[in-house]
Curated annotation (Swiss-Prot):
Biased composition (Polar residues): 439-468
Source lineage: Eukaryota, Fungi, Dikarya, Ascomycota, Pezizomycotina
UniProt entry tagged with the keyword Hydrolase: no
GO cellular component: chromatin; HIR complex; nucleus
Known role: Required for replication-independent chromatin assembly and for the periodic repression of histone gene transcription during the cell cycle.
Listed name of the protein: Protein hir1
């Protein structure tokens, strides 16, 4: 092993002269070196190009420098070969990270100036804190000190998604070589694993709203890790089995935690460094323990991985998986901490940079680490994970770039053909799938002059047909179907023969225009929706509704015929007897003499087991005349509301894991007494005890004489809803904020979000209160309109209404309701009516429906906390409702019948533009919903999609109308239209908008 440290390999700094009376800031010369010393800039990062020919470094001088690795390895060579290949200065601050893309085409750098620079290798060249590239170069992920993880497209460099899941600085990122996950390390003492699917080259932020999902959070190895480390650069092993996480601790000792894939735990720690380890780097190659001359095809030796670690103790350690101790420990390699490590692609050289400006290389001889195995062994070890590494390992050159341009041209033709088929272009569809020329994998047709027969003959070797030739010999199923349909004869009653007409759009690829695949994809996605890490401006449900939603009954205006007196008595007796059998407390006792008032039950003796449900709630008499009745929750012995330190609801300590118990901050508990009476009288029961705990310590306690059905609360207040329809509200210190609020029926849903409380009663009335201002934004509203009450009011018998699957409130006090029929509603306090935001019609008729389920919010970064709060208003509500529509539509099997309806409509005359019209209408509905809810980021996205679509469709009138509404004109009426758009888009602030309306 050789450590190479060339004198010229540095980011040269200024000359510091020991004489304080003079200083020199010009070029360094040997003469000046004798009277002073040169202070090199700190080097923060390094990386090696995929072909191993270039080393890139970044330092505090604001320069990105590219060096020749050949010159570094051969420092004794006296030839005048170039050493520094390039020097780029496009940043105004210290550059903290540089990374080559795995295909070698791009170089990314990030600095303190909050700018990410992407440098590209041109085929015809003219005279942030940390990044990571995916292994197929499809995405670039940047992390920084703002605690956000930003995903960029590796093709267009557009921002695809911002993940705000960390609570502190993010200082490390690594990608899974199987291209399924990436991991980030943060100063919040966690490593978070994200699952992703490589986006297509033309993907947009809207397409990827449901990609990049948080898989798990790892915190155990880092609970007491120091926060002084400058980096937490982790690394993924080349076989995909392990993650090496820097800055871990094992007791009081600094270590490197080895995390196992899948289970995301680990009991292996690399211990040996005296200071925190700031960077880990696995060698990109697998190594064999046997030399090549002793390897056989059946026995190539044990495959091992090699990892290098360095950090604040200025030492470098090299570990092999078969040894419990490091094979090499090099100390005092630099005067300050080692900041980054980078391996050459062949695994024979390791480069390191340090904060004192040191850049060095460590060259290994054959057998020092083992014997590098072929890259095919890496791919073989990754096949068990189902790798999807499109384009991985292909180093870009000028010739390769020219070939890529030709490939893209062929791919573009294939895309145009498929888009023509999807949009109902019969000519394009027939050209792409019906004629004899099959498309290649990139969408390009075979070259002219070649036939399928000739191609099949070319694939034969020694008289044996290859699988490719066998695949080419298989008949096209769409072509066969088309041939069967072409000459299908039918006979009329009089014996005449007719040929059935063939709809061109009904065969081949035209079937894919129906959105069936989009709906089914959402079922296969196993993603936990609405996780605490998701950004969605809705109250978090803590006391889940029954499976299938909260049941509702609708009663018509017509009444049943009056029953005879005897029948009525018999009916009452049966009802009372049945209620007694079910455990209900009888109001009337069925005796031999008839129905008599029930006598008080004697108190039970001995120790009694506390049941989960004590009894059904006693319903209010007003429900007997209400046309809408919602299911009332049973009386439970204990009702608990737990929140974490951020104020978000979480699982109570008794039902959570040990890891979750540590996150519980406050617990609000209501204990209902048993039905037994203390004095023998039914009215003399124990009071309900309400207690607020922090850990095991009670903070305050109160008592109520009424049975509690529901509780809710956050860091702003606590509330309890009682069986008699009263609602009590307390401050965080336990002071009663208002007198009891009395409703007309029992509360069935109680939610809160900030200072807002949502309460829904058993007769379907929605109440919204602001406890900060002790006010309500609107009068009580009924749920009857959203439960199809208008359809059922003429019936003589009760009918089941759609169940309520979600009823929540956002940070502005807007009520959001989702139903089991897939529809989603929001109440407009300015128009005093419900608005339908989502329905199943869009799911099967629109081309813009979501493809998969995942977290439902996405916020862009803003400069201030106030702007963050404004940007978060109503964030993710529209995707949340649309996801509920997809789930409920598929759950109840409505998608099949709706798609059959769409298919029949597409075959009829006059419905040629059906899909286009429905898609545009869906975008208009989204746009209006985002404007009504005040969802800033969704409005930006939907407005861009809508403008592109109506422009592509050539809808001149709609384009002019949209521009007039956005830009405005000389008339005040147009200005009134413009101001709401400008406020929502953030063009003007609230105060400026008010001044604009007054002028």
């Amino acid at each position: 092993m050789h450590i190479i440290k060339p004198v010229w390999l540095t980011h040269g700094g200024k000359l510091v002269v020991h004489d304080s009376s003079s200083s020199w800031h010009g070029p360094l010369t040997p003469t000046l070196l004798s009277t002073g010393e040169r202070k090199d800039f700190e080097v923060y990062s390094c990386d090696v190009s995929p072909d191993g020919s270039r080393l890139v470094t970044a330092a505090g001088d604001g320069y990105v420098r590219i060096w020749s690795t050949e010159a570094i390895r051969n420092t004794d060579d006296s030839s005048q070969k170039p050493k520094q290949l390039a020097s780029m200065s496009n940043h105004s601050g210290t550059i903290h990270t540089v990374r080559f893309s795995p295909n070698g085409k791009y170089l990314a750098s990030g600095a303190d100036d909050k700018i990410v620079c992407i440098y590209t290798l041109d085929a015809n060249p003219p005279s942030h804190s940390t990044f990571g590239w995916s292994y197929d170069s499809s995405i670039l992920v940047s992390v920084g000190l703002d605690s956000k993880v930003v995903v960029w497209s590796g093709h267009t460099f557009e921002k695809l998604k911002t993940l705000s899941v960390h609570q502190s600085h993010v200082k490390g990122i690594t990608f899974d070589p199987a291209n399924k996950y990436f991991a980030t390390a943060s100063d919040d003492r966690t490593v978070k694993i994200f699952r992703f699917t490589s986006p297509a080259p033309n993907s947009t932020a809207h397409d990827q709203m449901n990609n990049f999902v948080l898989e798990t959070t790892i915190s155990a190895p880092f609970q007491n890790s120091p926060l002084t480390a400058y980096f937490r650069r982790c690394s993924w092993s080349p076989d995909g089995m392990h993650i090496a996480a820097a800055n871990a601790v094992n007791g009081p000792v600094s270590s490197v935690a080895i995390i196992n894939r899948g289970s995301w735990d680990g009991d292996i720690n690399l211990i040996g460094h005296e200071a925190p380890v700031e960077v880990c780097a696995f060698s990109p190659r697998l190594y064999s323990t046997q030399p090549p001359n002793k390897q056989t095809p059946d026995n190539q030796g044990q495959a091992v991985t090699v990892i290098a670690c360095a950090g604040g103790d200025k030492s470098l350690s090299i570990w092999i998986t078969t040894n419990p101790r490091p094979i090499v420990v090099a100390q005092e390699l630099a005067a300050k901490s080692i900041s980054d490590l980078a391996w050459s692609p062949d695994g024979t050289c390791l480069y390191a940079t340090a904060l004192d400006g040191t850049i060095l290389a460590v060259r290994f001889e054959d057998g020092d680490l083992g014997y590098p195995m072929a890259m095919e062994e890496n791919e073989k070890s990754l096949t068990k994970f189902g790798t999807n590494r499109r384009g991985a390992g292909i180093t870009e050159t000028t010739d390769g770039l020219l070939l890529e341009e030709k490939s893209k041209a062929g791919e573009l033709k294939g895309v145009e053909g498929r888009m023509g088929a999807l949009m109902g272009d019969g000519h394009a569809s027939a050209e792409a799938t019906v004629n004899g020329k099959a498309l290649s994998s990139n969408g390009a047709a075979p070259a002219q002059g070649t036939s399928p027969t000739a191609d099949a003959q070319k694939t034969q070797t020694n008289g044996t047909t290859t699988p490719a030739a066998q695949e080419a010999d298989k008949p096209d199923p769409y072509q066969a179907k088309l041939e069967r349909l072409k000459q299908r004869p039918t006979y009329t009653k009089d014996g005449k023969k007719r040929i059935a007409p063939l709809l061109v759009s009904g065969a081949g690829a035209a079937e894919s225009s129906l959105p069936q695949a989009r709906l089914m994809a959402s079922v296969s996605s196993q993603v936990k929706a609405d996780t605490p890490q998701s950004i969605v401006d809705l109250s978090k449900p803590f006391d889940g509704l029954p499976k299938g939603g909260l049941a509702a009954l609708l009663f018509g205006n017509k009444r049943k015929l009056a029953q005879l007196e005897g029948d009525e008595d018999g009916h009452v007796e049966k009802r009372v007897a049945l209620a007694s059998q079910n455990g209900a407390t009888p109001i009337m006792a069925n005796t031999p003499d008839g129905l008599l008032p029930a006598q008080p039950q004697p108190p039970a003796t001995g120790q009694q087991q506390t049941p989960e449900y004590i009894r059904p709630a006693v319903t209010n008499p007003c429900m007997a005349i209400s046309q809408l009745r919602l299911a009332v929750p049973k009386v439970r012995s204990q009702i608990v509301r737990a929140i974490d330190s951020t104020g978000k609801p979480t699982e109570p300590p008794g039902a959570s894991s040990e890891a979750n118990k540590s996150r519980v901050d406050l617990v609000f508990e209501a204990r209902n007494p048993s039905p037994a009476s203390l004095t023998g009288r039914a009215v003399d029961r124990e009071p309900v005890r309400l207690t607020l705990f922090r850990g095991e310590q009670p903070l305050w306690q109160d008592f109520l004489p009424r049975t509690v059905l529901l509780v809710t609360g956050n860091q702003s207040m606590w509330a309890a809803a009682c069986e008699d329809g009263s609602v009590y509200i307390w401050t965080p210190a336990g002071r009663r904020l208002v007198s009891a609020l009395v409703l007309e029926a029992q509360p069935v849903i109680l939610e809160c979000n900030g200072p807002w409380i949502l309460c829904i009663s058993a007769v379907g009335m929605c109440y919204v209160w602001n406890v900060k201002h002790l006010s309500s934004p609107h009068p009580p509203i009924s749920l009857q309109p959203v439960l199809d009450a208008a359809v059922h009011t003429l019936g003589a018998h009760p009918s089941s209404a759609p169940a309520i699957t979600n009823a929540r409130i956002n940070s502005e006090g807007r009520v959001i309701v989702a139903l089991s029929n897939g529809e989603g509603y929001a109440y407009s306090p300015s128009m005093y009516t419900w608005q339908r935001m989502s329905e199943a019609w869009w799911a099967v008729g629109s081309q813009y429906w979501n493809t998969t389920e995942a977290p439902v919010g996405n916020l862009q970064s803003t400069d201030s906390q106030d702007k963050d709060a404004k940007a978060a208003v109503s964030a993710g509500i529209i995707p949340f409702l649309e996801r509920n529509t997809t789930n409920e539509t598929l759950l109840r099997g409505r998608a099949y019948f709706l798609q059959r309806l769409i298919k029949v409509l597409l075959s009829r005359e006059g419905y040629e533009s059906f899909e286009s019209s429905v898609s545009i209408a869906h975008l208009e509905n989204r746009l209006a919903a985002a404007l009504s809810l005040g969802a800033k980021e969704e409005f930006r996205l939907y407005l861009s999609m809508y403008a592109k679509r109506i422009g592509a469709e050539g809808l001149k009138n709609k384009v002019e109308e949209l521009l007039k509404g956005l830009i405005g004109g000389k008339h005040r009426d147009l200005q009134r239209v413009t101001v709401p758009y400008a406020k929502l888009l953030g063009v003007v602030d609230e105060s400026e908008a008010g001044d604009a309306m007054e002028t």
